[in-house]
């Protein structure tokens, strides 16, 4: 009886593993199609913050409010940054962005370039600067639509 129980137990494990392996591509396809609204998902007022390093200069920290219009454009209303202890505030910086159907994207804020991942409901953006010499990453959280 013990051998029979072990055989059926192993057979069930193998069946579940085969089912999971067969369904995995479908799950990935579903995940890749979560941002079908594309640019429209990135809409409203967001608070963004991040930390990192400017190579050869020192640490950097930023916080700001950005408005995304849902059409690939926006505006950084107010951004305060501290670079190696020197603080400055910038206002009204133009923003352009593209959201892909797999919820990845890219944006330009002024002269800075970023890659990001956005949640399917548009409530959270995780971003990283892609410009050479800057290691800076952070998040953006939607405050209101």
Report residues per predicted region.
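A subset of signal/propeptide-processing and intrinsically disordered low-complexity segments
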Residues: 7, 26-27
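Bacterial N-terminal signal peptides that target proteins for export
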Residues: 2-15
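Bacterial N-terminal signal peptides
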Residues: 15-22
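Post-cleavage N-terminal segment of exported redox proteins
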Residues: 3, 22-24
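Mature soluble binding/inhibitory domains
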Residues: 27-145
């Amino acid at each position: 009886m013990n051998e029979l129980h072990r055989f059926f137990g192993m057979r069930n494990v193998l069946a579940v593993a085969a089912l999971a392996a067969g369904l995995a591509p479908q799950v990935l396809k579903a995940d890749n199609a979560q941002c079908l609204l594309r640019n429209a998902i990135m809409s409203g007022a967001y608070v963004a913050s991040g930390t990192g390093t400017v190579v050869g200069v020192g640490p950097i920290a930023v916080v700001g409010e950005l408005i995304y219009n849902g059409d690939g454009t926006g505006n950084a209303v107010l951004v305060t940054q501290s670079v190696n202890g020197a603080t400055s505030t910038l206002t009204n910086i133009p923003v352009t962005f593209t959201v892909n159907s797999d919820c990845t994207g890219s944006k330009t804020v002024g002269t800075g370039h970023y890659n990001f991942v956005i949640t399917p409901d548009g409530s959270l953006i995780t971003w990283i600067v892609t410009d050479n010499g800057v290691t800076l990453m952070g998040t953006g959280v939607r405050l209101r639509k």
